[in-house]
Amino acid sequence: MATHSSSSSSPEVSVAAAETAWSDLRTLVGGEHVRAAIAEDAVDGVVPQMVIEPGSPEEVAGALKIATSAGLHVIPRGGGTKMDWGNLLRNNESRSGELLLSTRRLNRIVEHAWGDMTATVEAGCTFQRFQQTLAQHGQRLALDPLWPDSATIGGILATNDSGALRVRIGSLRDLIIGITLALPDGTLAKSGGKVVKNVAGYDLPKLATGSLGTLGIITQAIFRLHPVPRESRTLSFSNSEGGTSDGGSMNTLALAIQDCNMVPTGVQIRAGSASTPELGLHELDLRFEGTATGCEAQIEQTLRIASGARRIESPADVWNVRSTLWSGAEPSLVCKFSLLPVDLGTFLDLIRKASALLHLPWRLVAQAVGVGYLRIEGSDVAVLLHAVEDLRKKLESRGGSLVILRCPLEIKSKIDVWGSAGDALPLMRSIKAQFDRTGVLNPGRFVGGI
């Protein structure tokens, strides 16, 4: 497990290269925007050597070129909300250390073409600020990511963080239409939107989404926008109301609703063990958006399928419940799973059996039915590791996946948090080599140690 600080490594040539890089970086962005790293900058126990805050896409590209020449590993950081996602950083003891590159100063909303319903924004802009600006013209980026007040656009893209809105509107890859990436060789690659330059024929916006900053550092993105709905209504069904008895029944109801003419913009299933009643044993949440008349018509049609729903007066609490999975007793695991929507009931049964056998409290929030988040708590790290390996094996056998987002470092050192990439891994390594030949960006943190 790599827990070293970069200051503890380095042959003399690497130390000299790092000192030259520090000087060059100060010249590039100004001395006030380069500093020595502190303990709070650590990523999974690795304290970088220095922190830089470029102020433009060109400065990001220039910083990457300097870092590559000096043999520095580069760790991108936006709002810092998901810095513990991914595998352990590959040890850099034979090189010069690590450079943490913050996009904090890249926070401009470059253009809001409200007539075309598109917007261009820099990577360091927070999601909340972006939404507030778009709302002035009655528009929005139709996403509901985690921690919207502090999560940045670049970080949301790098981690592919969508939410319940994807049921109707689509995922992040459906909304991004252009991107600018700073590459390790110091160039800016642009694709989509109004831009003219493509990179080797790749669909760069989709490729960069979810890549955890391992191909290039996102500096700008162009998005397709949607109108802010006039009205929104949230209904919730529970296992004690409406005749449903478990999460599988809730899932069946959710699928039945989506198979009819109703078009909820949010579908969410909440579940938990008896020791986590604050989440509700089994709850199904539906969000309808549009005109008041349209929302009420869809609610009326929904109630013809299943009775016992209650209207939620504070819907923000319901739709933000996913973020509560990051709080609770430790040690714990927080995982993201994906599966066929029809398999969610079976997955819930597997979780219940494992929880009962190993005495592990759990909570689950499934958004878009086939994509969700699971928290498992336990006093023994070895038991947690056994539980997640068993659940992952069973999910992967049915074509699903289980990615560990947060866990103790002891577990991270023993497992690939991403799971198996299967036959896709050689292709992923090939793409990585084309964009980042020397492995400068977030080395080791992506799938298969990429």
Give the residues covered by each predicted segment.
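N-terminal, positively charged, Ser/Thr/Ala/Gly-biased leader segments
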Residues: 2-4, 10-75
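Conserved glycine-rich FAD pyrophosphate-binding loop
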Residues: 2-6, 11-13, 46-49, 72, ...
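N-terminal glycine-rich flavin-associated loop
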Residues: 42-75, 91-93, 99-147, 161-194, ...
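Short hydrophobic/aromatic beta-strand micro-patches
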Residues: 53, 238, 287-289, 338, ...
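Short, conserved charged micro-motifs
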Residues: 59-62, 129, 243-252, 293-300, ...
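Anion (oxyanion) recognition and catalysis
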Residues: 68, 135, 258, 356, ...
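C-terminal substrate-binding/cap subdomain adjacent to the FAD-binding core in PCMH-type
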Residues: 158, 177-333
